[in-house]
Amino acid sequence: MASSIWKGLVGIGLFALAHAAFSAAQHRSYMRLTEKEDETLPIDIVLQTLLAFIVACYGIVHIAGEFKHMDATSELRNKTFDTLRNHPSFYVFNHRGRIMFQPPESEDCHRNQAPFSSNSSLKLSKLEAMHR
């Protein structure tokens, strides 16, 4: 029920804002006809514009709901440590590490091949040594 009240308030504010814009345009055309183009808008149009803007903004703020906290702890509270810095889109497996970190006995057989050749199999010898 409360959200329909705020939506109605926003509707009234926007309607009043459109009415104020129409009144300002009508006043300007009247000033052109009377050749008094240097006069400002009447105070009632200015006040209607400001009041309509405030009413529309007040209704929009209540429709938007609860604001989030600005500190980072509120966003990080529901994340685990494993997913905090885990970015799978940055994983790269085709890099120069497979050539640089080969065991010394296999370096001699691969010296004739060009580095980063596509036909050589992907060897993660450094990771294999860590798992042993």
From Swiss-Prot:
Q: Which family does it belong to?
A: Belongs to the membrane magnesium transporter (TC 1.A.67) family.
Species in which this protein is naturally found? Xenopus laevis
Q: What's the protein's topology in the membrane?
A: Multi-pass membrane protein
Which InterPro entries is this protein grouped with?
MMgT (IPR018937)
Protein name per Swiss-Prot or TrEMBL: ER membrane protein complex subunit 5-A
User: Where is the protein found, in the record's own terms?
Assistant: Endoplasmic reticulum membrane; Golgi apparatus membrane; Early endosome membrane
Keyword Transport part of the UniProt annotation: yes
Quote one Gene Ontology molecular function term.
inorganic cation transmembrane transporter activity
Amino-acid biosynthesis among keywords: no
The residues exposed to the Lumenal compartment are 23-43
Q: Which GO terms describe its biological process?
A: magnesium ion transport; protein insertion into ER membrane by stop-transfer membrane-anchor sequence; tail-anchored membrane protein insertion into ER membrane
Residue intervals on the Cytoplasmic side: 1-3, 64-132
For this protein, the parts annotated as crossing the membrane are 4-22, 44-63
A GO cellular component annotation in the UniProt record: early endosome membrane
Keywords of the record, alphabetical order, are: Endoplasmic reticulum, Endosome, Golgi apparatus, Magnesium, Membrane, Transmembrane, Transmembrane helix, Transport
Subunit structure, briefly? Component of the ER membrane protein complex (EMC).
Q: What does this protein do?
A: Part of the endoplasmic reticulum membrane protein complex (EMC) that enables the energy-independent insertion into endoplasmic reticulum membranes of newly synthesized membrane proteins. Preferentially accommodates proteins with transmembrane domains that are weakly hydrophobic or contain destabilizing features such as charged and aromatic residues. Involved in the cotranslational insertion of multi-pass membrane proteins in which stop-transfer membrane-anchor sequences become ER membrane spanning helices.
